[in-house]
Amino acid sequence: MSKKSQLVFAMVAGELSGDILGAGLMAALQKTHPNARFVGIGGPRMEALGFESLFAMEELAVMGIVEVLSRLPRLLHVRSSLIKSITELKPDCFIGIDAPDFNIGLELKLKAQGIKTVHYVSPSVWAWRPKRIFKIAKATNMVLSLLPFEKAFYDKHQVPCTFVGHTLADDIPLESDKASARQLLELDPDAEYLAILPGSRGGELKQLAEPFVKAALLIKQQFPDIRFVTPLVNQKRREQFEQALKAHAPDLEIHMVEGKSREVMAAADGILLASGTATLEAMLIKRPMVVAYRVSPLTYEIAKTMMQVNRFSLPNLLAGRDVVPELIQHDCTPEKIAAAVGVELNRDFAPIKAEFERLHQLLRCDASQKAAEAVLALVDAKELN
């Protein structure tokens, strides 16, 4: 354990899921180093623990190649400013949390300045653009991976990697309480609910709000008594979703909640959601789900040439087989979504739930504590790779 009176950590989290991981890591580090200082880019959870944000986390919350290109000048300005600030700060360690296209370039520059670097959340190098492993090897002293199969990939390429598990698997109980969640959200205890989660970023709602709303109309025809509930990450995303609802299904009633996505999923009988970390959360809450995703045509055509796997949702990747339906790009239509939701709501869920339970146990490792121990061991290490 480091004997310094005050450790300084620079950290960059790019979106909501990174803020959750960052806050968990901060809390674990503060157990042994209560005076530690944390600086960089973080979200509200990290800031609640004393994190000093130099830029708003929203600056990095972009998706798809087209959107990134349009924001590139600003992203490059943020990164160059961070390089200058962090180099002057001389932290004991820099921790880039996810956001690999932003953070790995930042880590490369900082490591060249003699700063120890950690990348928390392995980029999907096993799924697409596998040659990124060579840049990661140059940019980081250590990768903290959330998924068990990732470590073998890094070991094969002799890149230091520690499997820490996933904080969501630690936080979410093995059995989620539907009745309590409904009581908290003031939902009918006896009705059938479908949770609709179109994503947390503006670009995701731009692509998914319309097909999800139109699918809900079709689902209502199949299941006349079903009700819909949608958590939106903030007021801006709520307004965006309301516009889609008004434009495409003005008479459809969807109960909207600000935040509380986990409670909404726990309260639901089934879930329709965008691909991403939320699919892992839905798996851990153990509800039937349909995963859908759509990006701009250009982004899709470019990404398609780089993909190494034929699955994209975390439950299917973890299971190594298709346990939940995936509808991507041209298959992400209201008709196909509604049909898939109908199948999932009517099928025997017991075998899928059993697989979700197995995967939950696999990921339950006290991730924040393991990550903190790995970071502190690196801080104490005399030799760098």
From Swiss-Prot:
It holds the Pfam family LpxB. Condensation of UDP-2,3-diacylglucosamine and 2,3-diacylglucosamine-1-phosphate to form lipid A disaccharide, a precursor of lipid A, a phosphorylated glycolipid that anchors the lipopolysaccharide to the outer membrane of the cell. The gene is lpxB. It comes from the Bacteria. InterPro entries: Glyco_trans_19. This is Lipid-A-disaccharide synthase. Coiled coil: none annotated. The lineage of its organism: Bacteria, Pseudomonadati, Pseudomonadota, Gammaproteobacteria, Alteromonadales. One of its GO terms (molecular function) is phospholipid binding. It catalyses: a lipid X + a UDP-2-N,3-O-bis[(3R)-3-hydroxyacyl]-alpha-D-glucosamine = a lipid A disaccharide + UDP + H(+). It is an enzyme of class 2 (transferase). It comes from Shewanella sp. (strain MR-7). Its EC number is 2.4.1.182. One of its GO terms (cellular component) is membrane. GO terms for biological process: lipid A biosynthetic process. Pathway: Bacterial outer membrane biogenesis; LPS lipid A biosynthesis. Keywords: Glycosyltransferase, Lipid A biosynthesis, Lipid biosynthesis, Lipid metabolism, Transferase. Belongs to the LpxB family.
